[in-house]
Amino acid sequence: MTQDNALLQAPELTLRDGSNSRKVFIKTYGCQMNVYDSTRMSDALARDGYEPTEDMEEADLVLLNTCHIREKAAEKVYSALGRLRDMKKKKAADGREMMIGVAGCVAQAEGEEILRRAPAVDVVIGPQTYHRLPEALRRAKEGQRVVDTDYAIEDKFEHLPIAESRKIRARGVTAFLTVQEGCDKFCTFCVVPYTRGSEVSRPVAQIVEEAEKLVEGGVREITLLGQNVNAWHGAGPRGEAWSLGDLLYRLAEIPGLARLRYTTSHPRDMDDRLIDAHRDLRALMPYLHLPVQSGSDRILKAMNRRHTAAEYLSLIARIRTVRPDIALSGDFITGFPGETDADFEDTLRLVEEVRYAQAFSFKYSTRPGTPGAELKDQVPEQIKAERLERLQALLLKQQQEFAESCIGKEIDLLLEKPGRMPEQLIGRSPWLQSVNVDAKASQIGDIIKVRITGTGNNSLFAERAEAAV
């Protein structure tokens, strides 16, 4: 799951207890799913009287919702915990209590080690057990130091409240909705199967209920989330087997839900029904994040991706046949163990053929406990960096070319937030680009017709073309 998409970066979520004046600050690291998880933890804590603060200094509870994907992720968390230890000590000297919690994938991976290395931490809770966070905090209040990272037998989502409409409305007109968690693919570079567990799909009724609540709260665009979201499966109303495509058709029936997206996908799980949904559903935006990681069959095999470059390109061609205006995004890793110059050139050729509107690329870094960490022929850091620089230059060129190709097009723009200038609003294009427009007499949540007039560093500019819808 990509971690650097501008649309999907979350604010730092916070909470406060009106009766007891308890406040909580949640710092979110990493992917979109952590953003969603922070929101759900926020809602769960609200039942115990916590409400938001944007000032860590005044928080009674500081919660780090962590990510374990990047290199040295755990060390960065320990560094942050060192600063929090000092803050906790200072507050204690002033007669004020502050609790510290660590959640997310570093919590899952490190467990008891966090309490050993960071004694100031009160609670460590994993991504599959955060519905038990309020109980863990109660135990910590009684003097226990709590580690709860065992995979829950119960469905955590059944125990998590859905926010009231007023809170949903305050969060904006776009929302995330997790429908699937975990991964069974076991790519040799990836820690997700070890930190998030095996693939689990939420039931249809549960997903539809949450989506309807979001729409009632003013949400107009929902992004379905999963570590491998297109592996989602469930039972339809007559007990028939459903895939993600079927779920999208059902969600598109919800009145008031104007837009749907989903991320992140695996090429092996792009079935016919999902491709049909891209053809048929006006609400499903023409944007697809479909990681490939490498253009070399040899490296793809070493990564355990279970597809070839040709199969990936064939899939892209099928999708573009049914949805010619679709914008493609991807993930790439340079310097995977054993990658030669020829392998890297294969990756560049694949990028040239696909022509991405956006992509994310990283140097390979060993993740302890993954098969990739045990492979020989590790690529020198300098070569990894040189290849990454070449790849990113090509991807940036393609991104700029895609943005320039939008000039002159009329598009539907969902208005999301105020701009920097008076009467300016910022929205998202169907292709996930940030668009600035003078939208006098329009409101956040409107979908208006605009004409793209220019490009900026990371955004587009537009003029009004029609009235709001």
From Swiss-Prot:
Catalyzes the methylthiolation of N6-(dimethylallyl)adenosine (i(6)A), leading to the formation of 2-methylthio-N6-(dimethylallyl)adenosine (ms(2)i(6)A) at position 37 in tRNAs that read codons beginning with uridine. Its cofactor is [4Fe-4S] cluster. It is found in: Cytoplasm. CDD domains: Radical_SAM (cd01335). The gene is miaB. SUPFAM superfamilies: Radical SAM enzymes. It comes from the Bacteria. The lineage of its organism: Bacteria, Pseudomonadati, Pseudomonadota, Alphaproteobacteria, Hyphomicrobiales. [4Fe-4S] cluster 1 binds at C31, C67, C105. This is tRNA-2-methylthio-N(6)-dimethylallyladenosine synthase. InterPro entries: Elp3/MiaA/NifB-like_rSAM, Methylthiotransferase, Methylthiotransferase_CS, Methylthiotransferase_N, Methylthiotransferase_N_sf, MiaB_methiolase, rSAM, rSAM_horseshoe. Monomer.
